[in-house]
Amino acid sequence: MSIIELQDVHVTFHERHNTVEAVRGVSLTIEQGEIFGIVGFSGAGKSTLVRTINLLERPTQGRVLIDGSDITGATGDELRKLRRNIGFVFQSFNLIDNITVGANIVFALKAGGVDKAAWHDRAVELLKLVGLDSKIDSYPSSLSGGQKQRVAIARALANNPEILLCDEATSALDLETTEEILALLKRINVELGITIVFITHQLDVAKQIFDHVAVMENGVIVEQGETFDVFSAPKHPTTKSLVDRYLGIAIPPQLVPSLPAGTIVELRYRGDGALEPLISDVTRKYGVSINVLHGDVEYFGPKPIGTLIVLIDGPAEALAAALDTLKAHVYSYRELNRERLARPAYGDGQQGEE
C-alpha cells in the first residue's frame, strides 16, 4: 500500500531576473514501510523534491498525497498535524546548541503537543533507541558528529511519525559513522515500521539500505525501480555515470608500460553469475590467454555486481571469437584504450575508454 504519492509535481522559483524550475513533472509512489532513496548529483533537485512531501516547499503545480489524502493545500492546524506525522533529519543536525540533548528532544515533544508529564520518559526512551541515553544532560557541543545525528534522529521520531525524511543525513560523517547511522535507520525501519525517504549523492549509502531508488537530474526523475535492478543495468546516462564513478576500478598507472601485448577489456557481471568459469572456458575453447589485471565486487543488498579488467591475447581469429563470447555472457563489456589507461578511472569518463 502506498503511503506517499507525488503526482506531476513541479516547483518553480521566481528570482529577480530569471525563473528556476527546480522540480519538473515528478511522479513517484512510495510504499508503506520501505526505505526509498532519491539519488543524483548536486543541483539535481533532490532536496527541493523531498521537502514537498511535508510541504516545506509547496508545489507550484501537481499534488502530494499522504495515506491517499491530498495534502497539497494544507494550512494551519491541518499542516501542523501533518508535519508531526513526518519527521525530518538534516545534514547539518540542526540541534539547539545552548540546551541539553534531553531538552532538544523535549522541544520537539512540546511542539507536538505531548503532555508535559510524559516528556522526560519519552526523551529517555528515544535516546535509548539511538544508544545515547547516557548523554541526556550533555550539550550538543560535547558530542561527535555521529552522536549529534543520533540525537537529531531521536528528535525526528519524538511524535511517532509514520514517515522519516533524511536529507543527506550521512554526507557530513566519516565512513564508519555513516555505516553506524545507516544500521540505526535500518533498525528503526524494521522495528518501528517507519517509511524512510533518504536523499543522497552517495551510492555507498544506496547499496546498503534502499529498497527502491529514483535517480534525479535537472529536476526530473530519469530512472527508478528496485535498487539492484537500477544500478546493475542502468539505462539513463546520469545513472550510468553514477554507477561508473562508484564501480570504476583503475589499473595502477605504473603497470601500464609493462603490460604485454593484447586487448584490454573491462567486464561486468551481476547477480549470482561468476566470471571465473567463463574465463576458463573461453581460454580452453579458443586457445587464447586471459590475464586478470584488476577486479572488484560490490554488493547491493545481497546481490553482487562484479568488475574485472582482463588482458586477452591470441591469434586474430581466435581472439575475435573469444571477445564475442565474453561480450555475450556479461552485461557490460568495454574495450579499453591502452594509451589512456594511466588516466584516473571515471574522472572525465571511463579509464581507457575509446
Question: What spans do the regions from the language model cover?
Answer:
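Conserved signature/switch motifs of ABC ATPase nucleotide-binding domains
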Residues: 138-141, 159
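ABC ATPase "signature
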Residues: 224-225, 233
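ABC ATPase NBD coupling module
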Residues: 15-17, 71-87, 111, 116-117, ...
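Conserved ABC ATPase "signature" region
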Residues: 69-70, 106, 110, 117-134
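Helix-to-loop junction immediately C-terminal to a conserved catalytic motif
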Residues: 54
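Catalytic Walker B motif of ABC-type/P-loop ATPase nucleotide-binding domains
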Residues: 164-167
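Short coil-to-helix segment of the ABC ATPase nucleotide-binding domain corresponding to the Q-loop/switch region
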Residues: 99-107
